[in-house]
Amino acid sequence: MGSNDLNTWVSDKLMVLLGFSQTAVVQYLIAMAKQSKSPGELVRELVECGFSLSGDTRAFAEEIYARAPRKTPGVNLYQQQEAEAAMLLKKQKTFSLLEADHDEDENNVKKQSASKTGKSDKGQKRFRKKSEQLEDDDDEVVIVREDKRNVRRKVSEDEDDGTESEEERLRDQREREELEQHLRERDTARTRKLTEPKMSKKEQEEFVRRDSAVDKGDIESLRKFSWQEYMKKRKQKKVLELKDDIEDEPYLFGDEKLTEREIREFRYKREIYELIKKSTQEEDNVGEYRMPDAYDQQGSVDQEKRFAVSVQRYRDMGSAEKMNPFAEQEAWEDHQIENAALKFGAKNKEVSDNYEFVFEDQIDFIKASVLAGDNYEDEMHAKPSQDSAGKSAFHMLQEDRKALPIYTYRDQLLNAVKDHQVLIIVGETGSGKTTQIPQYLHEAGYTKLGKVGCTQPRRVAAMSVAARVAQEMGGKLGHEVGYSIRFEDCTSEKTILKYMTDGMLLRELLGEPDLGSYSVIIVDEAHERTLRTDILFGLVKDIARARPDLKLLISSATMDAEKFSDFFDQAPIFRFPGRRYPVDICFTTAPEADYMDAAITTVLTIHVKEPLGDVLVFLPGQEEIEAVEENLKHKIRGLGTKIRELIICPIYANLPSELQAKIFEPTPEGARKVVLATNIAETSLTIDGIKYVVDPGFSKMKSYNPRTGMESLLVTPISKASATQRTGRAGRTSPGKCYRLYTAFNYYNDLEDNTVPEIQRTNLASVVLSLKSLGIHNLLNFDFMDPPPSEALIKSLELLFALGALNQLGELTKAGRRMAEFPLDPMLSKMIVVSDKYKCSDEIISIAAMLSIGPSIFYRPKDKQVHADNAMKNFHVGNVGDHIAFLKIYNSWKETNYSTQWCYENYIQVRSMKRARDIRDQLEGLLERVEIDVSSNANELDSIRKSIVAGFFPHTAKLQKNGSYRTVKHPQTVHIHPASGLSQVLPRWVVYHQLVLTSKEYMRQVTELKPEWLIEIAPHYYQLKDVEDATSKKMPKTSGRAVV
């Protein structure tokens, strides 16, 4: 379209939309359309210029965007000459490929000339004479030409190989960029930006009404609506004028005598105003029922009070209960009995004998030191609070918030956040950092600019803290306050305070590298120095430099915060006290041989001899917690009713949310609660009522050997910093005691000062893939607080290159970009990506989901171990391998409509299966995101196995003569785990999911493979000599030496 035609068209459109048109406006709109990147951006600019946000405006923006010519970069003379030279060089290269044919043609000509006859001797003599004269010169020229041709052949062959590999790399880069563009477009389409201008409800209704009227051509309804709106405004204006006239009458004419006409007119105005006022009041007091608002005294919504009545009245009775005339009476009695047993089971217990128990293996403790409290004297002399029995639960929560140590420093903290972009916050666990700081920022107005994000190192902490904050704010979890963890997202468009694991924030960085939807980022529990927290430090540091409007808060519970301050460019440190009461520290007089048995004895001794107060026991892991719980219950049953009620509450990561919440429930009067927890209770969770802490001095720490690729989760001694954190848990609500099950000599001489950061003792493959996806290629110069071992980085890069996630230049490939979208180990992600080739992606994501939940699928009750083992063997019929057995388990559970009873019958943990289902649903959604079709090929087990081998080909092992296995790459002796279905079969070649070190080097989740698959799938990784079977070779006969 020519420029004149475009100007005429825009002018006509302006007449229709605005009713006027000018040349300057037309030229301005065309220039705006040329500079806009998309029609949506052009619509926003038009609305800012005064256009109405309607369908006509959108259509006008799209059409002018399509008609406006785009500027194309001009080609200067130098670039044109370079392009011509490149084309000429390419042409010359193509000529060199025909030299072999030229030589053959010369040979053919010589043969034909030799066969010809009838030529005269005179001609031959002349030819011979001329050729003799030029023979010397021609020989030299031919030799030079042949040398040039040979060199040109070699160069062209090398250049062709390099050109092909370079073209392949560029093609892969283009495909990866297209995939990233598609992912960004999907994210943009599904995500609503918080910074976009939002219309009010009234404006939305008006826009919908006008839009529908324009579509129908109903201009008359628009006029009617406009007249109605005008009359409402006119009525309000006239009433105000009448009111002003009545009020001004005595002031203006108070001293003057009015005529009868003026008096009648004044009375008439007053009567009219009174009638209008009376009618308005009657409209406000309409005789209709309105739902009462459930607000508390401070104006916040009390959701508990709001829904309490509806929840209590509802009862889902079965058909048998409805036919029972005494159903309501029985339900009431059951409810009363349940309340009585829950609340008053230990309060009114009769004390029959008040003997002091003496345990055979009682432990002797010595009081070594006292951990002093802050403001302890003020707390002791403070006046007792008034009785709060009549106050609402919401009001009690607000009082609890004011009782936290951080409340005193609220204004100082907000001023510090306002004055500094990066702030290091130091306060002990339980001071209210995690729950209160995001609420303070919300109250200060930071959520108007974007969300407030708070990272947690553990899933349990993110869920429990988000639930607590939602309760304090009087809202429902998932609305204003939400959480996001791996395979579970409890947020909505209304969410302004978002708690998440540090890994989830890393995944958000893939789609939003600048974190534009956030106004504040809080990195909580920074002192734990987890793997992803250390990665976040370097990333948010760069983001804060690029975004001056972003506030960055680093929260730590340790007093040694200078290292964080130095890393974040000498950021200021904000400290406030957390512990309010002193804690007595007791050490054992001699080392303990069995820390679990010593912990049980210490708990029972505290329960019998010490005053009331809850007990917190730190144990390394889930297995230890379950063992201690069972032994405690057994000993309590033996003591009977001679002791008080002891409530045992475990807490660990795999525990369901409803069971995790029990640790926060108040303890009944007269009873004692003992919490068995992992090191999650050191800093991430604050449990009220804890007065005694039992610290065995051990925790489970993951370590990784990059040379062998073996991970081990070993029970190791804690550090002094962790011991101090554990001790501080006892001084929250009253003076407490900490019983350390090790000697003072061990504490001062054997324990390290700080825990080794996780980044220096774990597998870095997933982290390297994430950093590559974020565009960070120079990993050795990445800003780590504590750099990881260079050997671990190199091994991770080698693994990603072998999997095809990186090319020879270390750049991310299209397959690698797809792998980065899955929140899984790179090998599992590669297995899913390759499944598209073998048309079995539906089965592979089921296997990946089952592998992600770990080995906690089957359970073996002590009294039914044989039945549990037989149930497990039923899924391994045919020696299909552990991966196919997992697929059978999931499909069988799916066929029973996800039955809980089926899980009980087959000794399978329902909680693990439900989690696997959630993981699979998310993986299925990610398949569509990375443009992989969901296909099923259940009958072809070889295709499924090949997909598994394609992801885990570095994890292969070969059977040895002694019954053990030896890994093919980086040879070492390993064994099949006893829980595997192939532990008694011993196939010759296997591929394994994980290599762990317990009592031996065990392979977990094993599947048989054919050795030729390794050459077919990974020819770049395996050679024929690696997969040749040495047992099938016939060795030569040799004579052995005689025994002397």
Curated annotation (Swiss-Prot):
Record note on disruption phenotype: Embryo defective. Arrested at one-cell zygotic stage.
CDD domains referenced in this protein's UniProt entry, alphabetically: DEXHc_DHX16, SF2_C_RHA
Residues covered by region (Disordered): 99-134, 152-211
EC number: 3.6.4.13
Domain of life: Eukaryota
Annotated Basic and acidic residues bias: 168-211
Acidic residues bias spans: 157-167
Gene Ontology biological-process annotations: embryo development ending in seed dormancy; mRNA processing; RNA splicing
Reactions it catalyzes: ATP + H2O = ADP + phosphate + H(+)
InterPro entries: AAA_22, DEAD-box_helicase_OB_fold, DNA/RNA_helicase_DEAH_CS, HA2_WH, Helicase-assoc_dom, Helicase_ATP-bd, Helicase_C-like, P-loop_NTPase
Record key words, sorted: ATP-binding, Helicase, Hydrolase, mRNA processing, mRNA splicing, Nucleotide-binding, Spliceosome
GO molecular function terms listed in the Swiss-Prot or TrEMBL record: ATP binding; ATP hydrolysis activity; RNA helicase activity
Tissue expression per record: Predominantly expressed in flowers.
UniProt keyword Cytoplasm present: no
Binding site for ATP: 427-434
Motif (DEAH box): 524-527
Keyword Kinase: no
Residue span, Helicase ATP-binding domain: 414-577
PROSITE patterns: DEAH_ATP_HELICASE, HELICASE_ATP_BIND_1, HELICASE_CTER
Recorded family membership: Belongs to the DEAD box helicase family. DEAH subfamily. PRP2 sub-subfamily.
Protein name stated in the entry: Probable pre-mRNA-splicing factor ATP-dependent RNA helicase DEAH6
Gene this chain is encoded by: MEE29
